[in-house]
């Protein structure tokens, strides 16, 4: 049974892990971060948010540390941000989705409002799955570089 859905996946039953060259593409992150610096004045003119909570989910092999720049930016625009709090995102494994559901429930209860979910790459798959399973707790989903099918 698939971890995320009752539907049969169109993917093959077994997919090998990504190759080392493909995994090494993630090393481009510091250069991409540097590319944001010239855009910073424009980003600072973005409208302010309403203070609602946003949970940010990292991509594969990343953790909350890698989402700090994004979360700090969102905080500067008046959002209350949370990391996913589960260490490195090592892909679908037992307990991850259940922990994310509990975090979403707790964040929504604490704020009294729906929560926005931002997912980066694989984190976007978790965000979409949470929205599918708990739509009454989710305000919106934003995905960044997330695969879809």
Predicted regions and their residues:
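Flexible, membrane-associating and regulatory peripheral segments of lipid-active enzymes
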Residues: 1-54, 67, 72, 77, ...
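Serine-dependent carboxylesterase/thioesterase catalytic core
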Residues: 52-65, 69, 75-149
């Amino acid at each position: 049974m698939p971890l995320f859905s009752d539907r049969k996946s169109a993917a093959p039953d077994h997919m090998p892990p990504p190759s080392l060259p493909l995994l090494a593409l993630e090393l481009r992150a510091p250069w991409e971060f540097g590319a944001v610096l010239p855009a910073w004045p424009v980003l600072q003119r973005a409208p302010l948010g309403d203070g609602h909570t946003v949970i940010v989910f990292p991509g594969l092999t990343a953790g909350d540390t890698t989402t700090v720049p994004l979360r700090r930016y969102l905080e500067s625009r008046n959002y209350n941000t949370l990391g996913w709090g589960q260490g490195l995102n090592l892909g679908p494994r037992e307990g991850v989705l259940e922990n994310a559901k509990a975090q979403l429930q707790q964040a929504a209860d604490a704020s009294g409002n729906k929560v926005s979910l931002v997912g980066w790459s694989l984190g976007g798959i978790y965000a979409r799955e949470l929205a599918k399973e708990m739509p009454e707790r989710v305000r919106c989903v934003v995905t960044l570089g997330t695969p879809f099918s």
